[in-house]
Curated annotation (Swiss-Prot):
The gene is hemA. Homodimer. The keyword NADP applies. Substrate binds at residues 45-48, 101, 106-108, 112. It comes from Clostridium botulinum (strain Alaska E43 / Type E3). Its EC number is 1.2.1.70. This is Glutamyl-tRNA reductase. NADP(+) binds at residues 177-182.
Length: 401
């Protein structure tokens, strides 16, 4: 069966950051999980940790193995949800369409689902059922995004913090990290009339990618030379530890906004004790009214039928897959009967031309009845009457051995 294991929706960030998955160990995790699961996809983003898998059954022993592989403390089990079969499938489709994002309808999740899918595909970590589920979900996500026209009002944590800081008259910025979120943050920042941006990175080659004169690319270790002169700092690294400590921020100076887009958090919570500093973590940011939330909800809600349609298509595929062995058996039987009949005719017929004509006639007749039987079998399967139909067709077409 298909199942998903993830972190419950309202789990505090203090717990979520202890249940993260290290990106640099993704392939290792897949390899270890496959010892216990038939197929697995790890969806790990800055604000989502979910494992989709195929398994015969789920028990506490299996859950403990999964916790052990990710080095999670099993005392956090109460913060984990597990959904199976149709509930798991529906959850994936809703995730892919943006219904479960902290920021409703945010535009990064579809790409993140695709990336996770291809990582498992390339690692040969998928069975057919899980592979087809994600193919349907990704196709659904594309259709949903296109038809609901969410691209007309794109939103992400990066766009929200940039707009919020611009509205608060910030002119001097520092961005920490240049992964997917960091790049997106820089894109939004540079679309505005700002004075300068300090981009703190560990990879010095990134400097060659930046052509905007407002950007100063600095070594990550140099960030504290400039951080106290900034109006706004946006941190989005993948570090497993704090990168902005309380002692890094001076007590005296102009007001400074600090947005922490990372999970685990980049920013020391105690910085909030400094009068001139305001720190917002990813949970705080999700509550900021970006002005378009109601519009996005209406667009998404009115197009939810797309999700239901693709889910039903997947369920149909799954039901029809259950009769695939019988269809194969029917084709083999049909060929055996055809071969016997044409061999008998050849032995009795004197003229080659008659054999060719008979060959075509017998083959077309055999194919017609076989294909018609398969069509009926599929129709009855989708109606839920496959067992009775299977019994009748078997008794007609497949002789007892």
């Amino acid at each position: 069966m298909i199942a998903v294991l993830g972190i419950k929706r309202n789990t505090p960030i203090e717990i979520r950051e202890k249940l993260t998955i290290k990106a640099n160990k993704h392939d290792e995790y897949l390899d270890r999980l496959l010892k216990y699961l038939d197929g697995v996809i790890i969806l790990a983003t800055c604000n989502r940790t979910e494992i989709y898998f195929n398994v015969s059954f789920i028990n506490e022993e299996l859950l403990k193995k999964i916790f052990e592989i990710f080095n999670w403390n099993y005392s956090y089990r109460k913060y984990i949800f597990i959904s199976e079969d149709k509930k798991a499938c529906k959850h994936l489709f809703e995730v892919t369409c943006g219904f479960h994002s902290k920021i409703l309808g945010e535009d990064q999740i579809l790409g993140q689902v695709k990336t996770s899918y291809f990582k498992s595909l390339n690692a040969k970590a998928l069975n057919l059922e899980l592979q087809r589920l994600f193919q349907y979900a990704i196709t659904c996500g594309k259709k949903f995004k296109s038809q609901s026209r969410l691209f007309e009002i794109p939103v992400s944590s990066a766009s929200i913090v940039v707009n919020e800081s611009i509205n608060k008259d910030c002119k001097k910025f520092m961005v920490l990290g240049y992964g997917d979120v960091g790049r997106l943050t820089m894109k939004y920042l540079l679309a505005h009339n700002i004075n300068e941006v300090y981009l703190a990175v560990r990879n010095k080659k990134i400097k060659d990618e930046i052509v905007d004169e407002r950007v100063n690319v600095i070594d990550f270790e140099e960030k504290n030379k400039y951080i106290n002169d900034m109006d706004c700092v946006i941190s989005c690294t993948s570090a497993p530890h704090i990168v902005i400590k309380k002692q890094d921020i001076n007590n005296i100076g102009d007001n400074i906004l600090i947005y922490d887009l990372a999970v685990p958090r980049d920013v020391d919570d105690e910085i909030n004790d400094i009068d001139r500093a305001q720190v917002y973590n990813i949970d705080n940011i999700s509550y900021i009214n970006d002005g378009n939330k109601k519009m996005r909800f209406d667009k998404m809600d009115s197009n939810k039928f797309i999700l239901e349609n693709y889910l039903n298509e997947y369920y149909e595929w799954k039901r029809l897959r259950s009769i695939a062995p019988f269809i194969e058996e029917l084709k083999v039987t049909s060929k055996e009967i055809y071969d016997k009949r044409i061999t008998t005719f050849k032995n009795k017929c004197k003229y080659r031309g008659d054999v060719d004509l008979a060959n075509k006639m017998i083959k077309s007749t055999s194919d017609y009845y076989m294909n018609r039987a398969i069509e009926i079998m599929k129709e009855e399967t989708l109606k839920g009457s496959e067992e009775e139909c299977l019994r009748i067709i078997k008794s007609i077409f497949i002789a007892k051995k």
